[in-house]
Structure formats: C-alpha cells, structure tokens
C-alpha cells in the first residue's frame, strides 16, 4: 500500500465529497427556482397594501459611511429628495471617516438642512463596532418609528418610503428589503456578469425563499 495509492484514494474521496456538495447545492437552487416560478404570477400582480396616508409614521434614514469621498454627496442628495412629509422624516449621516470626507459631509449636511430637511451629521472617531456600532449608537437617538439603511453606493428612488412603509401595516412584516438595480451594468463584461448574479440572487433565491 504505497503513498501514491493512498493519495489516489484520498483524491477520489475528496472528489466524491465535492460532487455531493455540488449536487446538494443544485437541488437547493432547483427547489428555490420552482418556488419562485409557482408564485411569480402572484408577485407580478401584487399591489401595494392599503395605508392611511394621514397617519404616516416617523422614519429615520441612516447613511453609514467611511471615507466615501467620491459618492457621499450623491447619496445625501438622493435621500434628501425622498417624497415624504418633512415633519416625519429624519436623515442621520453616520460618519466614521478619517479623511476629507468629514468636511465634505459637513458642508453637504448644512446645505440640505437649509432646505428645511431634518438631517444630522454624527461623526465618530473611535469606530467602536465599526458599521454595526455606528448604526446601534445612532438608533438610540433616532426619532423614527422605522429605520431605513442605505450604503454609500445606493441611489434609492424618491418614492422608496411611500412604496415600502405601507407593508409594515401588517403584523407579519418586520423587515422590508427591495431588489437592487445597477447603474453601471453595461460598463463591461464583468459588471454585466455581476449584475446577472445579483439579479438571480434577488429574484430567484430571495423570491424562492420567501415563497417557501
């Protein structure tokens, strides 16, 4: 029983294990695809729940950022354009930056605040807990009954809150996550492949899990 014989058996066993894992993953993906297909028509015709628009809840939007010099102004401006009652809308810019992003945010926040929007710049220097820590600390002083979170590269539509908040009228709903789109999908073959993978994840995988 030589060393090479042992290695041969070991490789066969590892190959068999890899095949089993691939098979199990394929079965899981197939089941998600079947669930997605079964409920596709229902999702396509689903309407936004009825909601009492005179009794909208207060919403706080949190924007956690770290050294996002080139995109942070775009993010703040996009969120400031949300279609929502100004007296029920708060923006928290959670800034853990260590570069000139801090000054860029401060200037943009003052500009947005001058338009009558409730926005606050929370800058930390200790970075305790990193992103999760920033969100937790800010939540303690948030005014909103509901929290929306957007990363620095997000560009949510102006009607985002009006389209999502009504779902919370159901006691069965605790979290709402929406599907992403891609502003640079056609930039290169790599970005097209990345967009394809993310689209499959949100539509088939998440849709299938939700239907299960």
Task: For every predicted segment, state its role.
Residues 97, 135, 151-155:
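The conserved acidic donor/metal-binding loop of glycosyltransferases
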Residues 61-63, 91-93, 175:
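Structural beta-sheet core signal
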Residues 77-122, 127:
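Acidic donor-binding segment of Leloir-type glycosyltransferases
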């Amino acid at each position: 029983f030589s060393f090479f014989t042992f290695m041969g058996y070991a490789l066969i066993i590892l190959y068999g294990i890899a095949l089993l894992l691939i098979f199990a993953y394929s079965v899981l993906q197939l089941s998600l695809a079947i669930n997605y297909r079964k409920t596709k028509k229902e999702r396509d015709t689903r309407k936004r729940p009825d909601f009492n628009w005179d009794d909208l809840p207060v919403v706080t939007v949190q924007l956690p950022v770290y050294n996002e010099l080139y995109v942070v102004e775009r993010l703040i401006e996009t969120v400031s354009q949300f279609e929502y009652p100004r007296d029920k809308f708060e923006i928290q810019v959670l800034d853990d930056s260590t570069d000139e992003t801090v000054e860029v945010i401060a200037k943009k926040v003052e500009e947005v605040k001058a338009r009558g929007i409730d926005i606050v710049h929370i800058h930390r220097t200790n970075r305790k807990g990193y992103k999760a820590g920033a969100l937790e600390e800010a939540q303690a002083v948030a005014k909103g009954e509901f929290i929306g979170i957007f990363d620095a590269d997000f560009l949510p539509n102006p009607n985002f809150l009006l389209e999502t908040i009504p779902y919370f009228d159901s006691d069965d709903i605790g979290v709402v996550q929406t599907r992403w789109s891609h502003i640079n999908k056609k930039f290169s073959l790599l970005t097209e492949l990345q967009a394809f993978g993310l689209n499959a994840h949100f539509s088939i995988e998440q849709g299938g899990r939700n239907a299960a």
